[in-house]
């Protein structure tokens, strides 16, 4: 009897650096590459049309690349637990390979499939290639707990074994005599479906700003590295108006779907740095967003409640407001703040926004202005953001809402001043909010302050053609900072964490506390690897390296009822606080 192998694609939609597929092919007589698509999931899940289109383009590209090797992709409708027992029998399978999935849901799913495979006498090959490191080894090195500060994570990574080189690309030489049994009705049975077949209405759908697939990913990688001439001086390009637009060298959606190997990216960066710096070893910060990606994956891998506040041992329990109307205005770009609305419009139209734009809208929704739970924002990003990834999306939202990882809650983005500093002329606003196109730069970020005559000339009356601001930012941000301060003071008393820093008393700009200048070193929000093309860097928040465990296990009840009153804590309470150290480091 021959050796019949199946490789199951999930993420990792590529033929380069695919060690599980490469090992599966070795010694096999036949190989079939499958992708399992649940049609019910397509119609009911919280995933928008742009993300589905990107995925289908990835599958089409993968199929096209397999065709060049006299093989094909088998897209199978159904659920894995139902599909595999049938395939094992029908195709007489003896070997199954998968890329290791570190997320709790993926681990549970894969354990069930491995059990079915064992019962059917099928060998299972699992290899790590979606992350740079074996996350379990990082946790083991840290005494069995995930590191919860980036500084600690860097320390652990520096002690790890050197990374393995990327696996050879699957070519006809690698496949050798291994064949793929194909039938004449392959397209009918196993073809990649269209958006329409999945039930999506594509009328009025604009062309993709981010085309999916490995071919596009590798082209972008080469362009990205060509732009990395700044590596010579180890400097980052400054953020400007153009940074806000989708870049032809952006990589984050490709890393999220595994069209691009993070290992290949890592080693290409390393080679470039060594070439420029005459073989000196690159600092960890060169790999900025790749390491933030690993950090969040590590934090999430053993925590099935990572995307929830309640029951999540690393998440501060904050009594957020429930306000569906305000949430809808934010999600649909109807807040009355052009900077926020333009960002949310770009997100809905294109499926991507710059990482600092993510910070701005996340802060506005949560601790900055609306005091709505980060879980609600995370769900909107999950629907709309091409690079939304369970671990990174949840981790970034906890981080940006000061619910975990980061406690400098007095750093608040101003929804007027931040945009104005980034794009003084307002071209970004005009592009995504054409209704405001007629406003001069002086008023385009706060059009409600424009005299009525200017509004008439612009053919846009505030409150009629464009909404008035939904909130007074100066008042809301001040109140919310006080709310956060009280929550963290209670934390400090209950747990002795000493996480508070002194709160500046005078907000600048339009009442917002500008915590970060555009282009500062901060991790991306909600992204699979962030926007690597922008050279985004790192801001390290080190509270020492002691482990932060169960920040507020007591939950909501322990915090009393006065937390939203805005009452300023006493000077004695202020004196008990300990300010976190902020460490800057050059970015990648």
From Swiss-Prot:
A GO CC annotation given for this chain: mitochondrion
Motif residue range(s): LIR 13: 492-497
Motif (LIR 4): 255-260
Motif (LIR 6): 285-290
Renumbered ranges of motif LIR 7: 335-339
Amino-acid positions noted as binding FAD in the UniProt annotation, renumbered to this chain: 252, 289, 355, 387-389
Molecular function as annotated in GO: DNA binding; DNA-binding transcription factor binding; double-stranded DNA binding; E-box binding; FAD binding; histone deacetylase binding; kinase binding; nuclear receptor binding
Lineage: Eukaryota, Metazoa, Chordata, Craniata, Vertebrata
Gene induction: Expression is regulated by light and circadian rhythms. Peak expression in the suprachiasma nucleus (SCN) and eye at the day/night transition (CT12).
Record function comment: Transcriptional repressor which forms a core component of the circadian clock. The circadian clock, an internal time-keeping system, regulates various physiological processes through the generation of approximately 24 hour circadian rhythms in gene expression, which are translated into rhythms in metabolism and behavior. It is derived from the Latin roots 'circa' (about) and 'diem' (day) and acts as an important regulator of a wide array of physiological functions including metabolism, sleep, body temperature, blood pressure, endocrine, immune, cardiovascular, and renal function.
Superkingdom of the source species: Eukaryota
Keywords: Biological rhythms, Chromophore, Cytoplasm, FAD, Flavoprotein, Isopeptide bond, Nucleotide-binding, Nucleus, Phosphoprotein, Photoreceptor protein, Receptor, Repressor, Sensory transduction, Transcription, Transcription regulation, Ubl conjugation
Residue window of motif LIR 3: 151-156
Ranges spanned by the short sequence motif LIR 1, renumbered to the chain: 50-54
Record field: compositional bias (Polar residues): 545-568
Protein name: Cryptochrome-1
Chain span(s) of sequence motif LIR 10: 411-416
Short motif (LIR 2): ranges: 82-87
Motif, LIR 8: chain positions: 379-384
Photolyase/cryptochrome alpha/beta domain location: 3-132
Motif (LIR 9): 395-400
Placement of sequence motif LIR 12: 486-491
Motif (LIR 5): 271-276
UniProt-annotated stretches for the region Required for inhibition of CLOCK-BMAL1-mediated transcription: 371-470
Species in which this protein is naturally found: Rattus norvegicus
Post-translational modification: Phosphorylation on Ser-247 by MAPK is important for the inhibition of CLOCK-BMAL1-mediated transcriptional activity. Phosphorylation by CSNK1E requires interaction with PER1 or PER2. Phosphorylation at Ser-71 and Ser-280 by AMPK decreases protein stability. Phosphorylation at Ser-570 exhibits a robust circadian rhythm with a peak at CT8, increases protein stability, prevents SCF(FBXL3)-mediated degradation and is antagonized by interaction with PRKDC.
Cross-referenced PROSITE patterns: PHR_CRY_ALPHA_BETA
Sequence motif LIR 11, residues: 430-435
């Amino acid at each position: 009897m021959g050796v019949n192998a199946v490789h199951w694609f999930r993420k990792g939609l590529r033929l380069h650096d695919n060690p599980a597929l490469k090992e599966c092919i070795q010694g096999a007589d036949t190989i079939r590459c499958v992708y399992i698509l649940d049609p019910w999931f397509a119609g009911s899940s919280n995933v928008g049309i742009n993300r589905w289109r990107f995925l289908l383009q990835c599958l089409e590209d993968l199929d096209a690349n397999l065709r060049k090797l006299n093989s094909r992709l088998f897209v199978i409708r159904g659920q894995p637990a139902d599909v595999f027992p049938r395939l094992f029998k029908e195709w007489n399978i003896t070997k199954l390979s998968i890329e290791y999935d570190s997320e709790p849901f993926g681990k549970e799913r894969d354990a069930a499939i491995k059990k079915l495979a064992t019962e059917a006498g099928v060998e299972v090959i699992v290899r790590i290639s979606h992350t740079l490191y074996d996350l379990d080894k990082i946790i083991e090195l840290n005494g069995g707990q995930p590191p919860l500060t980036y500084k600690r994570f860097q320390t652990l990574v520096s002690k790890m074994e050197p990374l393995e080189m990327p696996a050879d690309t699957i070519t006809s030489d690698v496949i050798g005599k291994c064949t793929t049994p194909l039938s004449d009705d392959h397209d009918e049975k196993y073809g990649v479906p269209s958006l329409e077949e999945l039930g999506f209405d594509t009328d009025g759908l604009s062309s993709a700003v981010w085309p999916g697939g490995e071919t596009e990913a590798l082209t972008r990688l080469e362009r990205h590295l060509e732009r990395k001439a700044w590596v010579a001086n180890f400097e980052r390009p400054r953020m400007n108006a153009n940074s806000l637009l989708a870049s032809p060298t952006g990589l984050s959606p490709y890393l999220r779907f595994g069209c691009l190997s993070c290992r290949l990216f890592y080693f290409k960066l390393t080679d470039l740095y060594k070439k420029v710096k005459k073989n000196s070893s690159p600092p960890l910060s060169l790999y900025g967003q790749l390491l933030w990606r690993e950090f969040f994956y590590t934090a999430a891998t053993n925590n099935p409640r990572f995307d929830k506040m309640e029951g999540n041992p690393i998440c501060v329990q904050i009594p957020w407001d429930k306000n569906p109307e305000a949430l809808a205005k934010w999600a649909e770009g109807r807040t009355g703040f052009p900077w926020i609305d333009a960002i949310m419009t770009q997100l809905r139209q294109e499926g991507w926004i710059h990482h600092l734009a993510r910070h701005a809208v996340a802060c506005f929704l949560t601790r900055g202005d609306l005091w709505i739970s980060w879980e609600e924002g995370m769900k909107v990003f999950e629907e709309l953001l091409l690079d939304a990834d369970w671990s990174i999306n949840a981790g970034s939202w906890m981080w940006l809402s000061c619910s975990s990882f980061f406690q400098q809650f007095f750093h608040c983005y101003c929804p007027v001043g931040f945009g104005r500093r980034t794009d003084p002329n307002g071209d970004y606003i005009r592009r995504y909010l054409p209704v405001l196109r007629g406003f001069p730069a002086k008023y385009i970020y706060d059009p409600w302050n424009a005299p009525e005559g200017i509004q008439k000339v612009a053919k846009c009356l505030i409150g009629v053609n464009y909404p008035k601001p939904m909130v007074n930012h100066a008042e809301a941000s001040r109140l919310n900072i006080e709310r956060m301060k009280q929550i963290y003071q209670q934390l400090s008393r209950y747990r002795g964490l000493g996480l508070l820093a002194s709160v500046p008393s005078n907000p600048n700009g339009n009442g917002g506390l500008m915590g970060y200048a555009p282009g500062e070193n901060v991790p991306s929000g909600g992204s699979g690897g962030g926007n690597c093309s922008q050279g985004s860097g790192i801001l390290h928040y080190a509270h020492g390296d002691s482990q932060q465990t169960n920040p507020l296990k007591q939950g909501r009840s322990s915090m009393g009822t006065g937390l939203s009153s805005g009452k300023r804590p006493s000077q004695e309470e202020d004196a008990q606080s300990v300010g976190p150290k902020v460490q800057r480091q050059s970015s990648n």
